[in-house]
């Protein structure tokens, strides 16, 4: 059994909310996307991606393929749909989105993701980031772990995405599978949340309450209070 709640806020500085999320406890499926593109195209790309993932998982024949493969296929399907829409409509040219999708079944956590929306796992009181950001700074730190992170964080390319759904000629869908236990908590966020809170603060909020609704509300409220200038989305799912 999984208890989950999600919350999204357009934030302190944005006119529109281009974040989208989905919670389907019957499918043990959770999705967060952060769209990009002018004229509301970002929210279109994010919603298309969320819809494609949910539809693909619902259509899965019993016993067919692993959840990780299924999630990968669903995101690839979203890529095709977004690129087709961009070719049909000039206003959608260049639109894209990040996405992180997770499914829990039979003691296994399956995750597929693109971009810098994140999934964290809280297990036995310890918080760990499961996904890895597809950003310029993450690429630089991966190639040179001894690099000056503080200096890189002030570089103008710091948060530029190196991978996105639909917005680039090629998209790489990353997948992760690992064991999960009763009592573990999943946290999925867009950068409007995790860019203004470190892992210590995120863990503190996750440990302060057992109710996913309260936790999600506190996460978004805290991000806004810390001056987040982006849309803020948090999904919290507790395995029971």
Predicted segments — roles?
Residues 1-240:
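PP2C/PPM-type serine/threonine phosphatase catalytic domain
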């Amino acid at each position: 059994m999984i208890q989950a709640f999600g919350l999204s806020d357009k934030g302190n500085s944005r006119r529109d909310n281009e974040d989208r999320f989905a919670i389907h406890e019957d499918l043990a499926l959770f999705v967060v996307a952060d769209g990009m593109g002018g004229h509301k195209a970002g929210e279109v790309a994010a919603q298309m991606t969320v819809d494609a993932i949910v539809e693909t998982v619902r259509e899965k024949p019993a016993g067919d393929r692993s959840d990780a493969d299924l999630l990968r296929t669903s995101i690839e399907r979203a890529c095709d749909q977004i690129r087709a829409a961009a070719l049909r409509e000039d206003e959608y040219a260049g639109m894209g989105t990040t996405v992180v999708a997770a499914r829990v079944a039979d003691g296994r956590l399956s995750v597929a993701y693109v971009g810098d929306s994140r999934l964290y796992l809280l297990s036995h009181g310890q918080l760990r980031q499961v996904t890895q950001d597809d950003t310029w700074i993450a690429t630089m730190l991966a190639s040179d772990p001894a690099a000056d992170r503080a200096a890189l964080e002030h570089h103008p390319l710091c948060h530029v995405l190196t991978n996105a759904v639909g917005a680039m000629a090629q998209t790489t869908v990353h997948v992760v599978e690992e064991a999960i236990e009763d009592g573990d908590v999943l946290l999925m966020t867009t950068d409007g949340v995790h860019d203004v809170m470190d892992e210590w603060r995120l863990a503190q909020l996750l440990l302060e309450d057992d109710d996913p609704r309260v936790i999600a509300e506190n996460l978004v409220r805290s991000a806004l209070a810390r001056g987040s200038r982006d849309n803020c989305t948090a999904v919290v799912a507790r395995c029971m």
